[in-house]
């Protein structure tokens, strides 16, 4: 055996025999509560100096990340500590570690983390800390490293986050979650089937996206952990979990998972002793304001593989629209025929989600009722867009009653009322104002065209016609927008102005005729007077 191997064995033996060793580890079966004392090791290389200030890094970890964990844990966890006072230089150049790729081997990561711990060992008293973060001046693919490094303080560092100095907040939260004992929520079955990066939980949990961007290639947004993770860490109390066995009918209400930790937060439906379905309410509040969608998020844990999302819209290749909800464009009913249960979203008040967990058969009836509501609603909307509003008030009334019946889980009654709403919507017609306005606008157009074919001599009439044309144009716009009453009013005003213009033109023509008559009459009188004067003059000369 070589001297080097012998020395290593003696070192390991010595380390294993030290009585005062304190392991920085995590018991997955226990809760993570209280202040998490964290040290940040800043490291650089002979060929790569740092560019970020320690103040910027301190703010990222002990202000921004701390703020996130306080909210996500409902005040049960905070992050405190400090970064090293200097950037410690590692013994090898940066290229020797090859840490920029996600495919970097664990051996290389462990070597880097070990060198970082040793480099900072003289400065840091590791007994004061429970968590270790190592930030490098070079590009490092974020990861959590398992290792076994003994320090001068009698501490074994067995886990640490390694990342670049420029790590994003969302990536930092994810890797710190690994330090707390959480797993990456990557569904490898879906991943291998080609749903990339939708093979994760989409954007519903920081632990589900290890790529740094969402399913559409956009930078990921920081949201709350799913209820499963919060339950594992002890942040959700047992009194906040509603356990419902399949087979019966139960009603419950959930508070939003990101609203502060008050009320019921999780419905748990066991499938077996190790597998179960979970329902949580995700609403745009707190960090969950960054969610792309909201509603009842249903997840499944089979006891072995990572958590899976039950997708209400499996036709899309992403999970951003996976939540169930009672609103247009979403399904409120999940039916599991194998386990024999259903989850029905009865009402979403934004601050409270009303749920019914029942049999699969009841879920099928609820699904029919919801589809009847959707059909009636779409028919009403289509007719309203076309302008067929006469009769829609009755359809709207029946639809409202149907929705009210659904929220009270009266699904048979919902079906009846929704069908009545649909039938009333089918019978909707255009209102009288629609017909009258259309007819009058056509008449107005004809009169304006007629007026345009002849010259008008009255300036007052011309101005009236110009104003009538403005009213006509505005009336056509209102008609196209479905404002029949305004269109009718404008058409009537245009008609009145046209009639007034015709009258003014007639008056002007009569005035012109009268003026011509007076001129002719005056000329005739003058001629007669002149003739008479001439006759008188001739008579005087004869005398």
Feature-to-residue mapping (PLM):
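Bacterial N-terminal signal peptides that target proteins for export
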Residues: 1-8
